[in-house]
Amino acid sequence: MNTMNIIDLHCDTLIKLHEQGCGLEDVQGHIDLDALRSGGALVQCFAVYTPTHEQVHKHKITTGPWEYFNTAADIFDREMEKHKELIRPVRCAADIRENMDAGRISALLTLEDGVCIDGKME
């Protein structure tokens, strides 16, 4: 029987980890490690959603958009290090193949909406 490798291009788990003060092993309401394993995930893209200034209090954010992006990236790095036997960050196709061969899930950090770059591409 062939199995399908799932590549999920978006989840809002990082903001939930920030709001809940938890880790990938116990986050409520979004992607967690058990769901990734049982769902046959090959790659999970973790979006950094940066709320607009009007929405920050709803998400327990007390810093500006750029600072929050860095906080979310730090959360991503922390979780990747904590669970490196199960999931590792990737930057290219070779990284995905390496993780797949080792039986690990690949994680890709992505940016949603770009509020944090404040219209500047430099």
Feature locations, PLM:
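N-terminal hydrophobic targeting/anchoring segments and the immediately downstream early-domain regions
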Residues: 1-122
